[in-house]
Amino acid sequence: MDTITVVENVFGEVERKVQKSYWEEHSKDLTVESMMLDSRAKDLDKEERPEVLAILPSYAGKTVLELGAGIGRFTGELAKEAGHVIALDFIDSVIKKNEEINGDIYKNITFMCADVTSPELKIEDNSVDIVFSNWLLMYLNDEEVEKLIGRIVKWLKPGGHIFIRESCFHQSGDSKRKVNPTHYREPRFYTKVFKECHSYDQEGNSFELSLVTSKCIGAYVKSKKNQNQICWLWEKVKCTEDKGFQRFLDNVQYKSTGILRYERVFGEGYVSTGGFETTKEFVDKLDLKAGQKVLDVGCGIGGGDFYMAETYDVHVLGIDLSINMVSFAIERAIGRSCSVEFEVADCTTKEYAENTFDVIYSRDTILHIQDKPALFRNFFKWLKPGGKVLISDYCRSPGTPSEEFAAYIKQRGYDLHDVKTYGKMLEDAGFHDVVAEDRTDQFLRVLERELGETEKNKEAFLADFTQEDYDDIVNGWSAKLKRSSAGEQKWGLFIATK
């Protein structure tokens, strides 16, 4: 055994002793308050438990492995529909309390006292449909997290799912603690570990984890204005060459450095045309009222959502397909104490109940969507009667685009329409009082200002970014100016009412 392995083992043993001591201290009272480390636990539990369960895929008749099961807040709920639940916790008194609460009611639960980091924990490969973990990885060190995720992927059947929920950045509960060994990590740590995890079966097939969704727990946003409760749902899939549109966004168009350089141009918190200036102008048209609910489709890094929530006291749900965008948005939310939650989601597959939102807002995003009529029908369904939709988006002039513009559209994967046709699609979806404005003149003024500021502040830009980054921005903005000045690329503003 080499020196590094010995040191890792020693640190691992110390970590486990510290964590076990911590939870033995907080498990003297086997109550929901002690498990959630919060005096308001009962109220929070009523709100968040159904929210968490609603994120899960169907577990009817399935095998569910619950890691860190505690006294069974979720165990009984899972057992109502699952074929078999394996409930595991490393504190003996806690798992016994779980069995006392749920064992007589549900005969499909196996209760286990075990440490998830122990090599003695044996779960058969490809035997589990869903692994469920609510506040667990934050009590493991980084190496333990990586090793456990590697084991979980092997335990899962192909097509199986992992749900994890963690406290990120800082403590949420108000319980007094003598010591607190919890690892309050940035969400991107967990995302990176899951994205980089691979496993192989006996036939040599390679499997990876594909993100289904990631979001703030809404109950904590509503009750505490706290965005640090983050959950992820991953699916075990066979590795393929085609990584899909989400990977394209995160690895090509919206890499982390790309997002930051866009923000440098658009202004802090913004990655769409005009930044704060156009956001304020457009949002002011919505006549927002305190307590209303807004859906932001393609929320980016959250600047517009923070503005709406802080200025008008509305609740905003921001969704974006880019993991990188949402990661930045959640990080920027910390400490703001506003009612904004974020979720990685595909607006073309996401479902909401009818009459959920007062406003649907989208800035320069729907250009990515190929089937706009279907999306607009969903917008109409999701809005309350009298609700409004506001969209700004890239458009094009009527007729056939030039070869150069057509190549640009294809390379970006855009679906562009002329302003009139765009407005007609909203009318066809059922909307009334449709305003479809050609805002290309404003677009040109904004582009010229943004390009001018970038060139004027070249030295400061190059202190934080590369020459290639600078050239990409200058060339990209110059090309947009050329296409728009020639009348090919347009920018539209659309407002409509249900």
UniProtKB/Swiss-Prot annotation:
Key words, A-Z: Methyltransferase, Transferase
PROSITE patterns, per the entry: SAM_PEAMT (PS51582)
Transmembrane segments: none
Enzyme class: transferase
Binding site for phosphocholine: S167, S172, G173, R177, Y184, Y262, Y394, Y408, R412, Y414, K480
Pathway(s) of this molecule: Phospholipid metabolism; phosphatidylcholine biosynthesis; phosphocholine from phosphoethanolamine: step 1/1
EC number: 2.1.1.103
CDD domains (alphabetical): AdoMet_MTases
Record entry for activity regulation: Inhibited by phosphatidic acid.
GO biological process, one term: phosphatidylcholine biosynthetic process
UniProt: N-methylethanolamine phosphate binding residues: Q253, Y254, Y262, Y394, Y408, R412, G413, Y414, K480
Pfam families per record: Methyltransf_25, Methyltransf_31
Binding, S-adenosyl-L-homocysteine: G68, R73, D89, D115, V116, N134, V271, S272, G298, D320, D346, C347, R363
GO molecular function: N-methyltransferase activity; phosphoethanolamine N-methyltransferase activity
Induction: Induction by cold stress, salt stress and abscisic acid (ABA).
Chemical reaction(s) catalysed: phosphoethanolamine + S-adenosyl-L-methionine = N-methylethanolamine phosphate + S-adenosyl-L-homocysteine + H(+); N-methylethanolamine phosphate + S-adenosyl-L-methionine = N,N-dimethylethanolamine phosphate + S-adenosyl-L-homocysteine + H(+); N,N-dimethylethanolamine phosphate + S-adenosyl-L-methionine = phosphocholine + S-adenosyl-L-homocysteine + H(+)
PANTHER family: PHOSPHOETHANOLAMINE METHYLTRANSFERASE, PHOSPHOETHANOLAMINE N-METHYLTRANSFERASE 1
Function description: Involved in phosphocholine biosynthesis. Catalyzes the N-methylation of phosphoethanolamine, phosphomonomethylethanolamine and phosphodimethylethanolamine, the three methylation steps required to convert phosphoethanolamine to phosphocholine (PC).
Similarity section: Belongs to the class I-like SAM-binding methyltransferase superfamily. PEAMT family.
Name this polypeptide is given: Phosphoethanolamine N-methyltransferase 1
Biological source species: Triticum aestivum (Wheat)
Name of the gene this protein is made from: PEAMT1
